[in-house]
Amino acid sequence: MKLSKKYTFRSRKVLLIILDGVGYSPKGPESGNAIAGAKLPFLNRVWNQFPTLHIQAHGKAVGMPSDDDMGNSEVGHNVLGSGRIFDQGAKLVSNSIASGDIFNGQAWKEVIGNSKKNNSTLHLLGLFSDGNVHSHIDHTKALISQAILEKVPKIRLHILLDGRDVPEKSALDYLNPFETWLDSLRKSGTDIRIASGGGRMTITMDRYEADWSMVERGWKVHVKGEGRYFSSAKEAIETFRSENPKIIDQYLPSFVISDNGKPVGKIQDGDSVVFTNFRGDRAIEISLAFTEKNFDKFDRGPLPNVLYAGIMQYDGDLKLPERFLVAPPAIDRTLGEYMASSNIPQYALSETQKYGHVTYFWNGNKSGYFDQNSEEYREILSDVIPFDQSPEMKALLITEALEKALNENKQDFYRVNYANGDMVGHTGNYLATVQAMEFLDGCVERLWKTCEKQNIVLLVTADHGNADEMFQLDKKGNVEKDSHGNPIPKTSHTLNPVPISILDPENKIRFNSKLSNPGLANVAATILDVMGYETPEGYHPSLIQNES
């Protein structure tokens, strides 16, 4: 990379702290803003006394179809790490369905051809909501409609209940009209049924190998038809809620739909299986279970010989899966790649829940290192418990590891993700999220003191909002309440901007407050700017104010 000729005051070393899920809202704690409700002496000083901007982290600013779409950690880190905006999975799949390209592709033809040739079942497995973070129910409906047009003999659905990217007890709001639609299809002669399911944080959708038992539980109900039997998904959900009135959708147990004591939709030899999630992190492990010959994460039993496809390819380096319906975004020339090619030392750190975000997603959906000699990646293992039970998560160990790395001063660019605001926020537990934020406050302060000592510039930002809006709000911005008058928890991300602050030990660097509509895509150039390097062609401009 070329050194910039514009500046003379750059420290050339930067620490980027990503406070996952910590957006900005002017609303107070009475509206569910856990950030406003927390005692944050250091972070409030940062946001009020150091140069700070609010930048866009949702919608079109991160490659989503519209500005009504929430940002998320995957697209956020893609944009942070690439300095540009790429159309993301949600938009790519929707566009491919609208154009018909998805159904003219070789993979779809193979999926349909396999079921017709073998007179076998087409299984659609994926997250069942319109959250548009991992999946969209409209995509599933489009696949069903096309499969019926092409006269697939039998269709079975394996639904993962959301309650995380959508309201926490909304499963029946999606299920009831969907079942009505399925009933109309059955009356027209289609053999189609829901076969299995469960909450997304109970089965199937593990990521970063945090808890393979989730995938095993999913395998048992989807593939083997082993589990608690119900006559319908509605009966399963209502039963689980009656047994545990406090349970929310993402934690609902697994279930199997049965007829006359037999599962209606086991996955068997000759079947076709499509995983309908477009986002990769929580799709990789179940895809490995279906496709990996030398698989040792759990006992699959006899592996059914199926034709497996993803609605997208989830890992381009691993070519996982080999068969996919829509090509993923082609993200090139990332910041990490540029730095590695120029031998600029980098350090990336997080706990398991966000480790892939500061590595794989930051690097443009690429696994591994660009140059292991100049890059150091560190993962701290996450606990396998509900995160509101331990809202500090692994923030202390992360802070200690990063302090050590900063004091060793071997790298020029450091990046870290603190998962607390997002992962605790997703539980819907307001008080636990307040505790998480208060714990993070001390961690960030410790790192700033180390940066001051080492003359390292500190950038503090987020990838999207979550902790900033923990209660459901109506269209007028008022808190929605349940029948007991209690605020209804919100577990999804928000549409709010995120703060970005710059802490310069020499107190020289300022933001350009006149930049039009800045977003996450401006952060990569900002990092290079502070380090004294020219911005690559095509990157969104730096947020730094030019020297006069």
UniProtKB/Swiss-Prot annotation:
Domain of life: Bacteria
Alphabetical keyword list: Glycolysis, Isomerase, Manganese, Metal-binding
Residues bound to Mn(2+) 2: D20, S73, D463, H464
Protein's pathway: Carbohydrate degradation; glycolysis; pyruvate from D-glyceraldehyde 3-phosphate: step 3/5
Catalytic activity: (2R)-2-phosphoglycerate = (2R)-3-phosphoglycerate
Family (UniProt): Belongs to the BPG-independent phosphoglycerate mutase family.
Gene Ontology biological-process entries: carbohydrate metabolic process; glucose catabolic process; glycolytic process
Role: Catalyzes the interconversion of 2-phosphoglycerate and 3-phosphoglycerate.
InterPro entries: Alkaline_phosphatase_core_sf (IPR017850), BPG-indep_PGM_N (IPR011258), Metalloenzyme (IPR006124), PGAM_B_sf (IPR036646), Pgm_bpd_ind (IPR005995)
GO molecular function: manganese ion binding; phosphoglycerate mutase activity
Organism, scientific name: Leptospira interrogans serogroup Icterohaemorrhagiae serovar Lai (strain 56601)
Binding-site residues, Mn(2+) 1: D422, H426, H493
Active site: S73 (phosphoserine intermediate)
Name of protein: Probable 2,3-bisphosphoglycerate-independent phosphoglycerate mutase
EC number: 5.4.2.12
Cofactor binding note: Binds 2 manganese ions per subunit.
CC per GO annotation: cytoplasm
Cofactor: Mn(2+)
Positions of substrate binding: H134, R164, D165, R200, R207, R279, G280, D281, R282, K354
Pfam families given in the database record: iPGM_N, Metalloenzyme
SUBUNIT field: Monomer.
CDD domains per the UniProt record, alphabetical: iPGM
Record flagged with keyword Metal-binding: yes
NCBIfam families tied to this protein: pgm_bpd_ind (TIGR01307)
